[in-house]
Amino acid sequence: MNLYIIRHADAGDPKQWQIDDAARPLSALGQKQAGALGEAFKRQGIVLQAVVSSPLVRTRQTAEGIMAALGLAGEPTFSELLEPGAMRPRKLSNELVELKVDSVAIVGHDPDMPNYLCWLLGLEQRQLYLEKSAVACVRTGKEPDKGEGTLGWLVTPEWFV
């Protein structure tokens, strides 16, 4: 399975947001990053069979921007395990297996996305950092598990924006 582990695009400064943080949308830069990431996937010939996202607004908008650039219809699949602080790596891997796909993008938050990436690669938590809109491609077997992933590549938004 190819997993594309993505931290949501730029959503501005959370300290400037006065309403419920779950409703914080992407900034203009974040909207550009999400679309550019989808365009970069297209240029590289990456075909996503599924996109799974945290239900929070900024992650949903990131996922939708990627999907729109790729011409994928419908909405992303939402997982409560991708909400901030809800990450359970093995449970998330089980959810991904249930999708019965070979290529899936996962859009979530810091520190959960880097920690899931580390779990897949067999590293201690917090050994890797994903900046906003960064993406890591991890290749796993049919059932992603701890330490069984291989890092294909990791890029920051400067690569595709």
Where does each model-flagged region fall?
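Extended, charge-rich low-complexity interaction segments
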Residues: 110-119
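Glycine-rich phosphate-binding loop signature in dinucleotide/nucleotide-binding domains
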Residues: 44-46, 97-102
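Short phosphate-binding loop-to-helix
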Residues: 83-100
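Domain-level recognition of soluble alpha/beta enzyme cores
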Residues: 124-150, 156-160
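Active-site-proximal alpha-helix that buttresses catalytic centers in soluble enzyme cores
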Residues: 2-86, 113, 126-132
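Generic beta-sheet signal
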Residues: 3, 101-108
